[in-house]
């Protein structure tokens, strides 16, 4: 889409500006992701004690948790870099997860884990497309509107 840049003040006046709408649903799914990641940490500690701190799969779980934080922190703050940073962190986490399968202890490597990873890859596609194409995300974080938006022809652009 050909986006038209608007000023931050114009963006704030736009009806789609703000942390609202489908952005809440996307946020909720990411919070669920954090909960499932923490559940993974609990599973590793329960099954292997605290020794897994030296196990790559344990570190990967914590890294995955850290990679989800930029979106969760930056989205409500309306940080301009949120879409780019969040997409990059998300796909780095997926790549690490996919690359870590060989390091996971046998009991943790099961169909449940594979199903979760498949879900999160599919969600990653939705997450990425939403952050790239959403009108709300573009207005709020990137201060730009679509070509048919009334603000695209504002006096500030002339």
Task: Name what the model sees in each region.
Residues 1-158:
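Topology signature of small-to-medium multi-pass alpha-helical membrane proteins
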């Amino acid at each position: 889409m050909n986006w038209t840049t608007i000023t931050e003040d114009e963006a704030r006046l736009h009806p789609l500006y703000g942390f609202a709408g489908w952005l809440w649903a996307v946020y909720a799914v990411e919070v669920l992701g954090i909960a499932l990641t923490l559940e993974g940490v609990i599973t590793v500690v329960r099954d292997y004690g605290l020794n897994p701190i030296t196990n790559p799969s344990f570190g990967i779980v914590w890294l995955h948790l850290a990679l989800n934080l930029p979106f969760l922190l930056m989205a409500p703050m309306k940080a301009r870099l949120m879409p780019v940073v969040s997409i990059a962190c998300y796909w780095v986490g997926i790549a690490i997860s996919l690359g870590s399968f060989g390091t996971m202890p046998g009991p943790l490597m099961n169909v449940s884990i594979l199903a979760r990873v498949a879900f999160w890859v599919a969600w990653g596609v939705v997450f990425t497309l939403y952050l790239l194409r959403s009108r709300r995300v573009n207005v709020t974080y990137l201060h730009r509107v679509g070509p048919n938006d009334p603000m695209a022809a504002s006096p500030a652009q002339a």
